[in-house]
Swiss-Prot record:
It holds the Pfam family COX2_TM. The keyword Transport applies. It is a multi-pass membrane protein. It catalyses: 4 Fe(II)-[cytochrome c] + O2 + 8 H(+)(in) = 4 Fe(III)-[cytochrome c] + 2 H2O + 4 H(+)(out). The gene is COX2. GO terms for biological process: electron transport chain. Its EC number is 7.1.1.9. This is Cytochrome c oxidase subunit 2. One of its GO terms (cellular component) is mitochondrial inner membrane. Its cofactor is Cu cation. CDD domains: CcO_II_C. Residues 1-43, 106-260 are mitochondrial intermembrane. PANTHER family: CYTOCHROME C OXIDASE SUBUNIT 2, CYTOCHROME C OXIDASE, SUBUNIT II.
Amino acid sequence: MILRSLSCRFLTIALCDAAEPWQLGFQDAATPMMQGIIDLHHDIFFFLILILVFVLWMLVRALWHFNEQTNPIPQRIVHGTTIEIIWTIFPSVILLFIAIPSFALLYSMDGVLVDPAITIKAIGHQWYWTYEYSDYNSSDEQSLTFDSYTIPEDDPELGQSRLLEVDNRVVVPAKTHLRMIVTPADVLHSWAVPSLGVKCDAVPGRLNLTSILVQREGVYYGQCSEICGTNHAFMPIVVEAVTLKDYADWVSNQLILQTN
């Protein structure tokens, strides 16, 4: 099979970004969007550590200095104007520092390319995905279309991830602007690939768009992230990013196979 031969060729040099056992951090970023999400997480985590240390210091100090032994007669404090101003302004400033980059990233995630190089349509079914490449057909021809099913647990090949590998991967060119159109054929689904920073819901009756720029060659694993029925856990997503030349060869071979 053409897709499997391409997969074997690039498997030795390409990174495989998938979930790992006992993983605590993010997967390696493969798009500017995911890199922005990771950077924002690290920046916010820095503020969280500062707040945690300050609150713990206040609690320990209060327990140490204001107990029955050191302060047998407690003071009755109704209010303090200075401290109230401080604990109102200081958290507001922290939230402002967090909100500015958060909104900038949020608006960049909502941006849709006006003229993408490639458009791919992902259609969610119970329980598999269908992909359409409609840029390579004329008006009277069928789009390049294929279904993507999970590899059964009892039939994996050497090196394949359990419940994450599929029979037909989504092949895309690296360093090329892509537009993903996501929609379902039945119920709610969600097309999500963590390394790409993409999670696009498939809502019945709607076409949702998202833009992707894969910056490096590799194999990226995801799953349906919206509960969609009994076999929801068996709807993996595999995106393989290759060079533009190999992508063109793959498209040509797929078109030949489809016409035959």
